A protein has these predicted regions:
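Conserved alpha/beta-domain cores
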Residues: 2-116
Length: 116
């Protein structure tokens, strides 16, 4: 049986303090947001925060909301996710099934939730 989160807590990925607090929350899943909640000048710092997380040890599922396909930040987001201990990816501004399929091919078996 697969566990499906009921509560999803979005947290800006550029704040170590907010990330730590979110991980300690009672949410079923924490979504580390690299997209709209992070200013363009802070995107690299946000990716560094994700790299510093290390491995999960219980608690909520970890998901990452990446920048949209085709954006200037998308490729860098995927490089961080490839090395992170995450349950899945949240894909914003998806334009259809082809976007989800493309992302799935790039990331292997990592689940994708699309925001259309």
């Amino acid at each position: 049986m697969t566990f499906e989160p009921r509560s999803w807590l979005f947290v800006p990925a550029d704040s170590e303090k907010k990330i730590a607090k979110a991980i300690e929350s009672e949410a079923d899943a924490v979504i580390f947001d690299l997209e709209d909640s992070v200013a363009p000048a802070q995107k690299a710092a946000a990716r560094q925060c994700l790299k510093a997380l290390g491995k999960r040890s219980g608690g909520p599922q970890w998901w990452v909301r990446i920048n949209p396909l085709g954006s200037e930040h998308h490729k860098d987001d995927l490089e961080v996710i490839a090395k992170a201990d995450v349950h899945g990816i949240v894909l914003p501004k998806a334009e259809g099934g082809a976007d989800v399929t493309e992302l799935a091919h790039r990331t292997g078996n990592i689940p994708v939730h699309a925001i259309v």
